[in-house]
Amino acid sequence: HAPAFWRWLDRAAGGRAEKRDVILAALFMVLANRYDWQLFLEVTGPGGSGKSIMAEIATLLAGEDNATSATIETLESPRERAALTGFSLIRLPDQEKWSGDGAGLKAITGGDAVSVDPKYRDAYSTHIPAVILAVNNNPMRFTDRSGGVSRRRVIIHFPEQIAPQERDPQLKDKITRELAVIVRHLMQKFSNPMLARSLLQSQQNSDEALNIKRDADPTFDFIGYLETLPQTSGMYMGNASIIPRNYRKYLYHAYLAYMEANGYRNVLSLKMFGLGLPVMLKEYGLNYEKRHTKQGIQTNLTLKEESYGDWLPKCDDPATA
């Protein structure tokens, strides 16, 4: 009944039924304005993969008058936030290579009151009850390590770049004409709205989302090379002043070796690394345990086998002795 929409959806989902359901759940969240789920949507993928059509459909579902475009800087600034009040959908198109802690984004999606400072009027505090949809070629890089952003972030990746000759310039108009059918389908499919919510939550820690985050955040990628042991008999935390470096014994040394091997300069301090570790491990479904010993903090973590081939210095390196 909505051939253009289904064709777009099938390509965006790579023909996978479970991915189709996640995209539909995201559209339902916009339609029903479920800002109270405290999630924000981030659609990533190469140019021409159908991301902008996703934003167009979301705008149609929210209603053109209820949607606005902004940048992530708008969300972070009390002066600029004034422009966002009164909308139920906030689109963030192409936040190219943005990096920051996302405090405003976290507060708005978390349902916290944020300060708004309009020109020529007194500042005040308010809630912004809107669903946020970011559309990016490259995923945003959040420096927040508390888990406040990752707990709310739903990444949906559109991997396939549609060849220019296959693109339909009339696609948006065709889908606009199918809107009534799309709305009816979403309302029927998610007559229990919690089904949509649980689909989005399961997407948060899906392999797809983890891989996108690994590509965007080197520290998060390093955590993917760790596995847990049944007891705290694994690597010690270590610190930067222990010489010579022992990459197999000390976790922090292994992290520094990973960053160096991959040419990353902005390493986390030991303190920030230690604070972020349990939160990032949790995203991989792993539990962090540690104990204090005479040799320092010992953890339940060890390096996976693939670390040795991918980036760990070889044994004949004198620094590993």
Describe the function of each predicted region.
Residues 62-77, 99-102, 118-123, 129-130, ...:
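Positively charged interface segments
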Residues 59, 67-68, 176-221:
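Phosphate-handling catalytic cores of nucleic-acid transaction enzymes
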Residues 1-86, 154-157, 186, 195, ...:
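P-loop NTPase catalytic core of nucleic-acid-dependent motor ATPases
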Residues 19-23, 51-54, 101, 179, ...:
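Hydrophobic (often cysteine-bearing) scaffold residues that line and stabilize catalytic clefts
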Residues 80-125:
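Conserved nucleotide-sensing/catalytic segment adjacent to the nucleotide-binding pocket
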Residues 54-57, 83, 87, 101-108, ...:
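Alpha-helical scaffold elements adjacent to nucleotide-binding pockets in ATP/GTP-utilizing enzyme cores
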Residues 21-25, 39-42, 118-121, 186, ...:
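Short coil/turn segments at secondary-structure boundaries
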Residues 88-91, 132-136:
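Conserved two-lobed SF2 helicase motor
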